Amino acid sequence: MTRKIRCALIGPGNIGTDLLAKLMRSPVLEPVWMVGIDPDSDGLKRARELGLKTTAEGVDGLLPHVQADAVQIAFDATSAYVHAENSRKLNALGVLMIDLTPAAIGPYCVPPVNLMDHIGSGEMNVNMVTCGGQATIPMVRAVSRVQPVAYGEIVATVSSRSVGPGTRKNIDEFTRTTAAAVAQVGGAKDGKAIIVINPADPPLIMRDTVHCLTETAPDEARIVESVHAMIADVQRYVPGYRLVNGPVFDGNRVSIYLEVEGLGDYLPKYAGNLDIMTAAAARTAEMFAEELLAGRLALQPAAQAA
């Protein structure tokens, strides 16, 4: 049997449970622990049924088992408010943290844009921005790699049913972190992010709108080509990522309209916001796992982790 890198998941909510389904299919990652705080949570129950070890004592319930169970990568799908402490405790044991909260204490990772930049940099914490960021930043980058973008604005519309209590508590962090990453990763000089939580029933599929203001008149042909190439890159790990309309050109404004259909691993297919976040996190962790398995990466305990 091929050796796999063992992982722990923190937070058995919508995102953590959807991520677990993806990790169960991974050729290089083996989920062994699910960490929560409510012993009666559906996510912990599902994890136990799938053969994972579980604790309802939070990260402190996992720490004594990290070395015995050879956990090397942890995914935090809890809240920005507790992530820094979770990361500090696990980094101190040499565990690499993939952050699915908007805490953003580590560098941003949007796989089709900057995944390979994280190889060999020695970081012990990478941040997956937000679901809105994962869906829209590739499009901002698709424009900015053609010509300078003065301003990028994204609007992510998601179904109320797909947004759990952790995400709801982090709305301000969501908008700040996404806007910062639109600039830092997307390449816009200034960024803004808006999230709309839609209570419609039946639930609507995730929809995203991206507006970019270019500094000079848009090179329409090259932007169209760049956008389609980037969409193909995202579809490699999120097959339900689709261009609905655009790029639409109006003066220096370039507008791109997207929808994201999920695989239906945990919530139904309308919850593409879960899918794009968890698929990006799994893709990022697999890259690190491949480096670990090949002997090109060694994780060091971080004495003074963030």
Curated annotation (Swiss-Prot):
Active site: 131 (acyl-thioester intermediate)
A Pfam family the protein falls into: AcetDehyd-dimer
Family: Belongs to the acetaldehyde dehydrogenase family.
Native source species: Burkholderia lata (strain ATCC 17760 / DSM 23089 / LMG 22485 / NCIMB 9086 / R18194 / 383)
An MF annotation (GO) of this entry: acetaldehyde dehydrogenase (acetylating) activity
Taxonomic path: Bacteria, Pseudomonadati, Pseudomonadota, Betaproteobacteria, Burkholderiales
Record protein name field: Acetaldehyde dehydrogenase 3
GO BP field: catabolic process
The keyword Oxidoreductase belongs to this UniProt entry's keyword annotation: yes
